[in-house]
């Protein structure tokens, strides 16, 4: 699957014939943010600041001490910092790490794409084995950024099932990093919005579309990788992406709409529709 004017890139190292991102000394491929991301981010930050101000005022009213009042939001930030640190520690302690000697073909893909996106530092990459989650993830702690790949991307023999699909999913997560979605202060500044039903989720969906824009800008031929989220590594080749994308337009119902408004990731049908028709932005709300 390729868009109009898509760049033809050299073969991905280790995968003859597959696309990869431009080298670090070449022009960085631009990718637009979803138009709803910036306004939703502003609203979410505003809501968080209002909640923080209300909390500070409540503590000051109860204690009469500005020291205690200031300590509460500082404690929230400190706890969140520690939670991120523990999540990162869990990956380091339990997960398989992609390296030049361990899944080297995946490592080369990550390095190439990170350079093409202009990242000054290549994120660490881990493989999540088992569990119910088929999605890949991007996160961070301190100055470190890391990606988590699902074992659904690998076959029983340990080889990558589909190099182009993996490259697209890696580019999606690197897009989160390039767009600043994994930063500590950005996440802290929007914590309050997560307490408002639908608000934090709407920002999260917009960020997912932004990450897809990055992935499509670098690996347009791998956009069919969205089928893996729907069918997993074993069934995705049998999924008709066009049929699923059409359902984003034809499926109706209040419960379905409510679901789309509350989830943090775009539904598979809406995401596939956005990837198939690049003339339209992904649907965040209606």
What function would you assign to each model-found segment?
Residues 1-132:
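Hydrophobic or amphipathic, alpha-helical segments that drive membrane association/targeting
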Residues 102-108, 112-121, 197-251, 277-281:
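Short helix/loop segments within enzyme catalytic domains
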Residues 129-146:
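Catalytic zinc-binding patch centered on the HExxH motif and its immediate surroundings
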Residues 173-190, 220-223:
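Catalytic Zn2+-binding segment of zinc metalloproteases
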Residues 157, 170-178, 210, 214:
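Active-site His/Glu-centered metal-binding helix of metallohydrolases
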Residues 152-168:
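Short pre-active-site segment immediately N-terminal to the catalytic Zn-binding motif
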């Amino acid at each position: 699957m390729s868009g109009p004017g898509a760049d033809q890139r050299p073969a991905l190292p280790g995968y003859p014939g597959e696309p990869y991102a431009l080298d670090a000394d070449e022009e960085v491929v631009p990718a637009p943010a979803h138009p709803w991301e910036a306004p939703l981010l502003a609203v979410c930050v505003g809501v968080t600041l209002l909640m923080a101000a209300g909390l500070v005022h409540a503590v000051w009213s109860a204690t009469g001490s500005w020291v205690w009042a200031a300590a509460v939001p500082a404690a929230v930030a400190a706890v969140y910092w520690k939670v991120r640190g523990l999540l990162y520690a869990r990956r380091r302690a339990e997960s398989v790490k992609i390296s030049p000697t361990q899944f080297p073909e995946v490592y080369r893909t990550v390095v190439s794409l990170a350079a093409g996106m202009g990242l000054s530092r290549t994120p660490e990459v881990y493989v999540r084995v088992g569990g119910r989650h088929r999605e890949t993830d991007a996160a961070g702690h301190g100055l470190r950024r890391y990606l988590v790949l699902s074992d659904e991307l690998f076959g029983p023999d340990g080889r990558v099932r589909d190099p182009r699909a993996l490259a697209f999913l890696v580019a999606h997560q690197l897009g989160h990093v390039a767009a600043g979605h994994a930063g500590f202060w950005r996440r802290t500044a929007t914590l309050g919005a997560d307490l408002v039903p639908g608000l934090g989720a709407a920002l999260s969906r917009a960020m997912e579309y932004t990450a897809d824009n990055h992935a499509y800008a670098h690996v347009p031929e791998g956009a069919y990788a969205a089928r893996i989220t729907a069918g997993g590594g074993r069934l995705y080749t049998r999924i008709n992406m066009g049929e699923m994308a059409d359902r984003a337009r034809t499926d109706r119902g209040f419960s379905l709409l409510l679901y789309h408004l509350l989830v943090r990731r775009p539904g598979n049908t809406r995401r596939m529709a956005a990837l198939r028709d690049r003339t339209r932005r992904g649907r965040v709300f209606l």
